[in-house]
Structures are given as C-alpha cells and as structure tokens.
C-alpha cells in the first residue's frame, strides 16, 4: 500500500452506525434474473458518500499512521463497561503507563484537525524540527489547496515584517495620483482569502504588525490605507518554539488571548527511526501524498462546522463546566463588594493575587481550586472549551457532548489562559513540582477535582438556584402579584441560606449574584404590576 492509501473500512464501526456483515444466502429456488444480472444502483443510495464525521476520522488516521510519525496517544478514553484497567508505574517517580480500553488519540494530530473542522485558532509549540509547520501545511492541503499555494500563502515571522508586507500594498500609481485615501486601491495578499491561514514563528513579528494581525484574528478584517478586506471564516495555525510569549518580540497579550487552543509537539520516538529513514530515502513528503478521499471541499468545510455546532451539550455537562469556572475566579480579599471579589479585580489594579490568596483562612489550600490559579476563565475561553468539546464529540461519532469529551479538550484550550499560582502548597510536593512543567496534566487534575466536589455537593439533584433561574426564564407574562411576592420570598430565603457555610467558594459567590439578578428582575416586574393596577383603578369610565 502507498502512503496515499485510505482504507475503506469504517474507522469506528460503532460511531459509523454500521452492523457487521453477515453471510446471508438466498433461499433455495429464490434466484431470478435480477439476482444474476443486477442493474446499476441508483445515484444517492447508501455507500455513495462518506459521512463527514467518518471522513474526519479517516483524515486523522491517515495523518497519524502515514503522514507524521507521532505515536503519542495522550488523549485517553475508556469503554466504561467495566473493562479491566491496565496501568504500569515506571521509574522512581512512578510515571504511569496506561493502556486505554477505547480508541485514544494523539493531541498533536487531533487538535489541529479539530481546529480545521471548527475553523478555530491553534498555536503549535515545540522545538525546531518537531513537525509543527508540516502539520499546519497538511491542514491547508486537506482544505483542497495545492501544496505550492499553501506554501506561498504561509507567512513567516521576522523582525522586518511590516503591515503592508503581510497584508497588502497600495498601488504606486494611486499613491501618486489619488486625491483622498478612498481613491487608493490596495493589492491584497492572496493568502487572506484562504480557508486555512498559517503564521510561522508568530513570536518574531514586530509589535505593530502583531496589532494588525490581532484585528484579523479577532474581527475577520484587515485595514490598509482606509481600505478594508474581509477575510471570512478560516482555520488559523500559528507556530512558535515556546509558549512563554518570548521570541524576537514579546507577543501582545491580547493576541495570545485570541488563540483558541495550544498544542505541544512531542519528541520523536527513536523506535520509529526505520520508518523515518525509509521516508528520507524515498523522498516522501506527506503534504504531496494527501489522498483525495480526505480532502474537504469548501461546501464540506461549511457543513462540518455547522454540524459540529448542532451537537448538544447536556445540562449535566454544562453545570460541571460552570462549577469548574466558578472555582477559579473568586478572590475573597480582592474587594469589599461581592461583585468585585475576583482575581481580575486584583490584576487590573496591579495587586498581588498570590498574596491575596494567602490571606484566605479557613480553607484547605491543598483542595481549594481557587488557590492554585492566578486567573479565571474568560467568556472567550468558555466558548472555546464548548466548541472544541462539541468537535470532539462529533469526531467520536456522538450527538451529545459527554463529560469525557469536555475533559479531553479543556487542558489544551486553557493551557495558555490559566496561570498557575506557584505559591500554592499543591506545587510544593514532589508530585506538584512535576505539574509545574506539565500544564495539561495539572489542568486535567483541576477539572477532576472540581467534578468530585460537584458530585459531593449533589448539585445534579439539588440545585435550587438553578430552579429559580429556570422559572424566571420561562417569562413573566401572566405572573400575578401574589406569585411574585412568593418567588421573592423564596429568593431571599435561599440568599440567607448561602451564608450558613461560612466560606466564600466560587460557586457560592456565583449563586449569590444569580439570586440578586433574579431578585432585581422580579422587583422591577412587581413595581410595574403595582403601577399598572394603580393606573387601571384611577381610570374613569
């Protein structure tokens, strides 16, 4: 088989919804002419096309088995049917070798592919020669572009890269003869219209050009000489040799925040050196052997993005994400007013977040999630987590997001967005010191701890604040004055009960503010009811 071969068998029969083939013969005497000489099958019958989720899986398996040697299955899933767990501890630190019971995946291959599907923004980090650029180029070829066009469209960061070099140059004749900026035409760079955009070594781009790039990433347009070019939806791939923001130029914080997901290239396993030599001797370049079966047209690209957005997120999964996010943001000593007691308040005023966290007493700093981080989750980060969790569920052939999908993608989305508090005693132990350099395992552990706390609190079955909000969101039309008073009394009772715990955990603070929100809505509605009833009573015949 050649490098461009894609097996026709389903990558995951259960996800594909196919039944195993069974040998079935005709009953004696039942053959007729149509059985011996079957007519051509009509167009549009089953088997003439591949479902987009199956096509996405085939693209992944071709990449991981044929294109890039990356035998690192660091995104693990389990069958969940009581299959025996196989884990071996290696070395003096007890490094765990776990053998998953369900299909598991290489993050360096899968996360860029999911970025392609959702048209997100992916940062590939790692040392030189690790395959970052090759992986990004493969994404461009998967979009149907010739290799030469992908390479021409790839932007290379360097200290002299200007805004016009990167985006477009005004025509010289217009610069000479134009009477206003509106008369100047700009020769836009062709890469701006591509569905896959690649910025190699983005941390070597000058700060001024980074600011222009930020506008393109954030708003989807670029401006040169008062002329606008809308770039449209695209999958972005940026590469860097480290994720500390360093390089020739420090990366602008706002630009780093626009990146949806960060993936590290893992080291090459010398066990696979024979395959590497074979590729070198055969001059094999994976980007030139991409099978047509895994290339996505523009229409398919639009369709797969729309299908991913239609994947449902069950309330139980969403509540766990909300609980996790709540734990990270609260900072009890950041302000006096409840709404301002967040790490963001302290950061904006130049405060020492780690010092403020040390002042919190009465907490177990080893289990308190807020103590381990210097920042919380932004709205953009929450949206990215949900989008990639949907993409993971879609890739695995599911119509609903499972908690394991969320757990798989969350560390890669938050890797560059949640900063650890190294003053926390969690990082003082031998195991904690390993987590300092392993942000993916640290963030996954945070999520696991949050889920345990969520289950211990029984919030799936006992969520009175959620009931209040659900009742409010049904609308106020027809709700009587007496019913409003009853609901306000319940809200006030719930608010008082929140103070019985004595400790201001993140979900408690968020529940308190949610109750205040509902109280304001009902109070305003009751004022309107009183005004309306008074107006009606004072009206003459």
Each model region followed by its residue ranges:
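Pre-Walker A (pre-P-loop) alpha-helix and adjacent loop at the N terminus of AAA/AAA+ ATPase modules
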Residues: 51-127
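Short glycine-rich substrate-engagement loop in P-loop NTPases that contacts/grips substrate
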Residues: 158-192
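Walker A/P-loop
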Residues: 113-158
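Conserved beta-strand position immediately N-terminal to the Walker
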Residues: 122, 197, 235
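Canonical AAA+ ATPase core
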Residues: 173-176, 201-209, 217-310, 390-392
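Interdomain "pre-motor" coupling segment immediately N-terminal to P-loop NTPase/helicase cores
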Residues: 3-75
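Terminal-proximal interaction/regulatory segments of ATP-powered molecular machines
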Residues: 401, 408, 412-541
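Basic, amphipathic alpha-helical bundle interface domains used for macromolecular binding and assembly
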Residues: 101-108, 286-424
């Amino acid at each position: 088989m050649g490098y461009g071969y894609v097996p026709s068998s389903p990558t995951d029969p259960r996800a594909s919804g196919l039944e195993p083939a069974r040998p079935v013969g005709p009953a004696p005497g039942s053959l007729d002419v149509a059985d011996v000489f079957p007519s051509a099958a009509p167009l549009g019958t089953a088997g003439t096309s591949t479902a987009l989720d199956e096509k996405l899986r085939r693209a992944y398996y071709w990449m991981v088995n044929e294109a890039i040697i990356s035998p690192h299955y660091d995104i693990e899933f389990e069958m969940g049917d009581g299959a025996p767990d196989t884990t071996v501890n290696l070395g003096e630190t007890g490094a765990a070798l776990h053998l998953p019971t369900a299909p598991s995946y290489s993050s360096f291959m899968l996360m860029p592919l999911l970025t392609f599907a959702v048209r997100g923004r992916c940062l590939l980090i790692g040392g030189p020669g690790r395959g970052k650029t090759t992986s990004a180029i493969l994404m461009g070829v998967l979009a149907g572009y010739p290799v030469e066009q992908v390479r021409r469209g790839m932007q290379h960061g360097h200290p002299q890269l200007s805004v016009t070099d990167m985006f477009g140059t005004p025509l010289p004749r217009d610069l000479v003869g134009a009477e206003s900026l509106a008369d100047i035409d700009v020769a836009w760079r062709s890469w701006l219209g591509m569905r896959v955009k690649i910025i190699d070594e983005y941390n070597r781009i000058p700060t001024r050009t980074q600011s222009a790039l930020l506008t393109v990433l954030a708003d989807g347009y670029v401006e040169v000489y008062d002329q606008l070019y809308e770039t449209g939806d695209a999958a972005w791939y940026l590469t860097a040799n480290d994720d500390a923001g360093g390089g020739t130029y420090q990366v602008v914080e706002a630009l780093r925040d626009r990146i949806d997901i960060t993936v590290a290239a893992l080291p090459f396993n010398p066990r696979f050196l024979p395959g590497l030599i074979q590729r070198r001797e055969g001059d094999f370049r994976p980007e030139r052997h991409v099978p047509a079966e895994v290339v996505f047209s523009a229409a398919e690209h639009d369709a797969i993005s729309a299908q991913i957005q239609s994947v449902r997120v069950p309330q139980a999964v969403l509540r766990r994400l909300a609980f996790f996010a709540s734990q990270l943001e609260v900072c009890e000593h950041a302000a006096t007013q409840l709404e301002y007691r967040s790490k963001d308040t302290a950061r904006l005023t130049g405060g020492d977040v780690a010092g403020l966290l040390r002042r919190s007493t009465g907490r177990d700093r080893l289990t308190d999630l807020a103590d381990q981080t210097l920042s919380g989750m932004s709205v953009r980060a929450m949206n990215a987590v949900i989008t990639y969790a949907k993409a993971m569920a879609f890739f695995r052939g599911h119509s609903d997001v499972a908690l394991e999908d969320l757990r798989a993608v969350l560390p890669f989305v938050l890797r560059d967005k949640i900063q650890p508090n190294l003053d926390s005693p969690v990082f003082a132990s031998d195991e904690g010191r390993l987590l300092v350099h392993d942000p993916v395992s640290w963030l996954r552990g945070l999520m696991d701890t949050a889920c345990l706390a969520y289950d211990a609190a029984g919030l799936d079955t006992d969520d009175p604040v959620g009931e209040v909000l659900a009742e409010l969101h049904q609308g106020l039309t027809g709700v009587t004055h007496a019913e409003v008073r009853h609901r306000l009394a319940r809200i006030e009772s719930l608010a008082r009960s929140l103070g019985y715990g004595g400790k201001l955990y993140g979900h408690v603070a968020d529940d308190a503010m949610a109750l205040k929100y509902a109280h304001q809505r009902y109070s305003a509605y009751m004022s309107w009811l009183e005004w309306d009833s008074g107006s009606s009573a004072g009206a003459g015949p």
